[in-house]
C-alpha cells in the first residue's frame, strides 16, 4: 500500500518508507 501511495503522491514516498 505504501508503495502505491508514494508513486501517486511522490513526496509521500519519503514518509511512507519511514512508516515501514
Swiss-Prot record:
It is a single-pass type I membrane protein. Its main location: membrane. The keyword Membrane applies. It comes from the Eukaryota. It is found in: Membrane. One of its GO terms (cellular component) is membrane. GO terms for biological process: adaptive immune response; T cell differentiation; T cell selection. Keywords: Adaptive immunity, Immunity, Immunoglobulin domain, Membrane. The keyword Ribosomal protein does not apply. Associates with p56-LCK. Interacts with SPG21. Accessory protein for MHC class-II antigen/T-cell receptor interaction. May regulate T-cell activation. This is T-cell surface glycoprotein CD4. It comes from Ovis aries (Sheep). The lineage of its organism: Eukaryota, Metazoa, Chordata, Craniata, Vertebrata. The gene is CD4.
Amino acid at each position: 500500500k505504501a508503495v502505491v501511495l508514494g508513486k501517486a503522491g511522490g513526496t509521500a514516498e519519503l514518509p511512507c518508507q519511514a512508516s515501514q
